[in-house]
Amino acid sequence: RQMCKETGISGCGTARELSRYPLDIVVVEKGDDVAAGASRANNGCIHHGQECKPGTLKARLNVEGNRGYRRWEKELDLNVLDCGALQIIQEESQMPELKKRYEVALRNDVEGAKILTPEETRALEPGLAKTGVPIYAALWLPTQRQIEPYETCVALAENATVNGVTFLFGHNVGDVLTEDGKVTGVITDHGIIKAPYVINAAGVYADDIAKMAGDQFYTIHGRKGTIAIMDKAKVPSYPRLVSQLTPEYHKGKNVESKGGGMHPTPHMNLLLGPSATEVPDKEDNSATKKDLDYTMTCNQDPNVTSAAFAFLFESLVYIIKI
C-alpha cells in the first residue's frame, strides 16, 4: 500500500500518475473535497520557464512540467487556454533587457522563444493595436498556458478513482508511524493507516508532517497573496498573457515575489495579482485594502477598472527555508 497526504494539485497529480501501476493507493485529505488549499486559489499559470534562474532545479521542472501538462490535457480533456506570453518593450533603451530575457529562455530550453518586431507583435495580438500600446519589440513565449486549477484537481482525482485509488476525506493526520527509522503509516482521527511509503503532499503543512516522521531538515513559511477576479462581462483586451516592461511595471512589482500580473483564464475572466506577504500564521488568508490596491498595479488593460471586480480570493502558498 502507498499513501499520499492531501489532495491539492501535487497530491492528486501524484496519485493519478501512480495509479498507472498495480499499487494499493490511499489518499488522505483533512478537508471535504479536493483542492481545498492553495490549489483552489491561484491564477492557474503553466509557466514557460523563462523567469527561472538557469541551471536550477526550478528551471528544469518548469519546462518539464509544462510539457507534462500537454499530456494531461489530452488524456484528461482539461480546459486549457493556450495563450502564450508576450513581454513588450516600448523603447530602444530596453532592448538589452529583452535580449537578456531571451537568452535566459534559450538557456532554460523554453520552446519557441522568439523576439518579435512591432508588426509581428500586433499581428499576433491584435488587441494591442486597438488599445494603442507603443511597441518597440517583444519576446514571444508560446508555451505559456492557463488552466482552471480546481477543475484540474477534480479531473486528476476522478481519473485516479477510476484507476482504483481510494480517497479518504475528512481524515486529519495527527502523527506519522515509524519503526527503525522508516515510515510505516499514519495515525488519523479515524484510525491507523499502515503503508510502507507515505508521500507528503501537505502543502504549507508539509514541514509539520515531516517533523512527525523525525525530519526537521527544513521549515515552511506561509506567504499569502490576493488575486482579484474581474467580471466575465468585461472581456480582456488581450486573450494572450501580455506584460509591458515599463518603468511603472518594475516599480509596482512586489519585492517579495516575482509574481503579480494580468492573467486571462480559460473561461476568459481576467485575474490581477497576486500580491505576496509572508505571514507567521498558516491559517491567515485575510485580504486587506493594501492587497487590493496592489492587484490594480498589475493591471495593464486600459479597458479594465476596479469597477469590474467580481471577487477576491486569498491563496496561502509557501516558501521553504533549509
What are these regions (language model features)?
Residues 53, 60-63, 88-97, 139-158, ...:
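Short beta-strand to alpha-helix junction loop
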Residues 139-197, 205:
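Helical element adjacent to the flavin cofactor pocket in flavoenzyme catalytic cores
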Residues 16-20, 46, 76-80, 175, ...:
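Active-site substrate-recognition segment that forms the wall
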Residues 2-27:
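N-terminal Rossmann-like FAD-binding beta1-loop-alpha1 element of flavoenzymes
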Residues 10, 33, 205:
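Conserved Rossmann-like nucleotide-cofactor binding loop
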Residues 44-124, 259-260:
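Dinucleotide-binding Rossmann-like beta1-alpha1 core, especially the glycine-rich loop
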Residues 19-41:
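Glycine-rich FAD pyrophosphate-binding loop
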Residues 23-25, 112-113, 198:
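Hydrophobic anchor at the start of a short beta-strand
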